[in-house]
Each structure stands twice: as structure tokens, then as C-alpha cells.
Regions:
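Low-complexity, glycine/proline-biased repetitive segments and flexible coils/loops
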Residues: 1-4, 8-16, 25-226
Length: 226
């Protein structure tokens, strides 16, 4: 949002963006790239951080913008950045399985969850991932990745030994609706930064669904390490 001109625009690619003439203060929604999920009974990828920054000062109406890319296989997402007069303003890329990020990645079976809000912002840019298996002998499913609006869901289901396909992947955390801030008229308004669903192992399991706002569903592993 360009104050004074009351113009709302959306930028989905990196580059130097030319705003309305005379623009010196903007309100911006900054959404980073989401992470990839893990393999096997892996945790879901965390959503990229989502921040609504109410007042960014600019030195001119030409603004360098970096739109963070999504993570490659098992990888973290990349930061999104707006370079203001006082320096870069950013949101943090999502955390892959067990990793911290804008929103944290879900846990793989017994590993720790990835923590969200890696940039230590207030209000927070995201949430933690969900938990995985219960004990080392129960390799059931991964937790869901955190979303901008909610933590990732924990894995669950009947308890069983490895290879029995007893687990249910955690759902991805829900995203956040930016429409109240930027209005419904913008083509890119809506819910963003949902977390990825946790994966599950074996044909009788259920993978986690993705969080609202772009989170991808987890997969069911029917082989070894896929």
C-alpha cells in the first residue's frame, strides 16, 4: 500500500519496483518462500514467514524487492526482502523438516519440531511445526509444518511397530488472511503461508493435508526412503 496515493499493488517476482511518483512510505505484506518436506515418514515443510509491516520509509519510489523462492528437496525456503531507507526489511524462509524458519518444519518421527518466528519479530511471522512419532520404536509419521496462522498438527493414529503403516501425518498449520489489511479488490488477497502436511509410511497410513493458504499435502511412503 502506497500511503497518500492509496494504491495497492502486488509483486511476485524479484527486481527493482517503481511505485507511484512521490511515494516515500509504504505498508507491505512480506511473504517468504516456503520449505520442502522431508522424505520417508518426514515432517512437512514450514511456511515462509508472513509479516505485515505498517510503515517502511523509502528514499525514492524505486524499491529493490527480493521474492524468496521455495525450498528444494528437504530444503529451507528463502527470505523475502524489501530494501527501505533504513535498510532491508525481511521475512524468513520456511524451515524444512525439524528446522527453524519463518514457520518451523514438522518433526520426523521422534526428532524435535522446527521452531517458527526465526526472525524474532512481534507480532510473530509464523509458528512451530508439529510433533512426529512417540518413541524410537514407533516410526509412524511426520508432523505438519507450521503456518502463519497456526502451529503444525501433530502426527497420530494407532500405535504400531515400524513398517506397519500405523501413523497419520500431521496437518499443515493454517495460513493467515491478509484481506482485512489490503482489501478484497487486490487479485492476490486471500489466505497465505499455510504449512505442508506430514508424510506417512506404509499403504495403510494417511498423510497429512496441507494448511489453508498454499500448504502442500504430505505423501505416503510405500517404499524405502522415498
Amino acid at each position: 500500500t502506497s500511503f497518500g496515493k492509496c494504491t495497492v499493488t502486488a509483486h511476485t517476482s524479484s527486481g527493482t519496483k517503481t511505485l507511484q511518483p512521490g511515494t516515500r512510505i509504504v505498508q507491505a505484506g512480506i511473504i517468504a518462500g516456503g520449505a520442502s518436506g522431508g522424505s520417508d515418514q518426514g515432517g512437512g515443510g514450514g511456511a515462509g514467514g508472513l509479516r505485515i509491516v505498517s510503515c517502511i520509509s523509502l528514499s525514492s519510489n524505486s524499491v529493490p524487492v527480493t521474492v524468496g523462492a521455495g525450498g528444494t528437496a528437504k530444503g529451507d525456503g528463502s527470505n523475502s526482502i524489501i530494501v527501505g531507507q533504513c535498510g532491508p526489511v525481511f521475512s524468513t524462509g520456511g524451515g524444512g523438516q525439524t528446522s527453524p524458519g519463518g514457520s518451523g518444519g514438522g518433526a520426523y518421527t521422534t526428532s524435535s519440531v522446527g521452531s517458527g518466528n526465526a526472525g524474532s519479530f512481534s507480532p510473530p511471522e509464523g509458528n512451530n511445526g508439529g510433533t512426529g512419532g512417540i518413541t524410537p520404536s514407533i516410526r509412524q509419521a511426520g508432523g505438519g509444518g507450521g503456518g502463519a496462522g497456526a502451529v503444525g498438527g501433530n502426527s497420530g493414529g494407532p500405535i504400531g511397530p515400524p513398517g506397519t503403516g500405523s501413523g497419520i501425518g500431521g496437518t499443515g498449520g493454517a495460513g493467515l488472511d491478509i484481506t482485512p489489511t489490503f482489501g478484497p479488490g487486490l487479485p492476490n488477497s486471500g489466505v497465505y503461508a499455510g504449512g505442508g502436511g506430514g508424510a506417512a509410511g506404509g499403504p495403510s497410513t494417511s498423510a497429512g493435508s496441507g494448511g489453508t493458504g498454499g500448504g502442500g499435502a504430505g505423501a505416503i511412503n510405500t517404499g524405502n526412503g522415498t
